[in-house]
């Protein structure tokens, strides 16, 4: 392949949800609401955990605060571009912007997978080894596990990105069935045989998501099996239910997209909305609605701030 041919394509056209202006205007309002909800919900959890002494010292809530930060970052990788594209007929993205988006999508996404696995281990220790919980899940270990999650995401994303940028792109340049740059649809546009690359990438992304999901489900199953009393099992199920809901909402779509041979389907676009937009929006609701301690801390935060504002007014 001639070098000039491989450098012809320096931009991609993303697939939108509609070409009808009135429909796109409605979708813009809907996704703007989703994105604002993501910011409000996740920032509120981070502020609540940081301002409450009990929550801030608890390993579970320390990890929850980090999960909220990852959710915020994850949605920000794709949603602002999506909102802007509702006003752009061509929905254009440069090659460099595409690679950057792809890198951070897999960086933050993989880090969140690893962190959810860490949170499952935290619940296992808390429920099955309660007497050793504070010793095992020390703040130092929590920081190491969070850092390891970020590092794991970075390594995973670096591998995916390096494999992608070494491919020649000379046309076509229409990224099918997605509103952002992701590995499966982008490498389909390469002017080369990508079979081996696809196997490597499926092994990378597919195995990470599938193995993490299996480990998570196994952890929660072990928790329920080890508890003998009905009351203890009921409490454990109540505690784990929110985690299981988050895990299913996030891992289900990811496994569907990444743990298969690289072929695109029309449903991929809607599946991508689930783990890029809907899950980060629902996570704060799932964790706060079922958690009395978080709700109580939020109420204290509102009361404290309300009293502060009243003092400032007087």
From Swiss-Prot:
Main localization, broad class: membrane
InterPro entries, alphabetized: GPCR_Rhodpsn (IPR000276), GPCR_Rhodpsn_7TM (IPR017452), Olfact_rcpt (IPR000725), Olfactory_Receptors (IPR050427)
Taxonomic lineage from the root: Eukaryota, Metazoa, Chordata, Craniata, Vertebrata
Organism: Homo sapiens
Annotated glycan sites: 4
One cellular-component annotation, GO: plasma membrane
Segment forming the signal sequence: none
Membrane topology, Cytoplasmic segments: 48-61, 120-142, 218-236, 290-314
SS bond list: 98-181
SUPFAM superfamilies linked: Family A G protein-coupled receptor-like
Family statement: Belongs to the G-protein coupled receptor 1 family.
Protein name according to UniProt: Olfactory receptor 4Q2
Origin: domain of life: Eukaryota
Keyword field contains Secreted: no
A molecular-function term among this protein's GO annotations: G protein-coupled receptor activity
TM segment ranges: 27-47, 62-84, 99-119, 143-163, 197-217, 237-257, 269-289
Extracellular side: 1-26, 85-98, 164-196, 258-268
Subcellular location: Cell membrane
Membrane disposition: Multi-pass membrane protein
UniProt keyword terms in alphabetical order: Cell membrane, Disulfide bond, G-protein coupled receptor, Glycoprotein, Membrane, Olfaction, Receptor, Sensory transduction, Transducer, Transmembrane, Transmembrane helix
Record flagged with keyword Ion transport: no
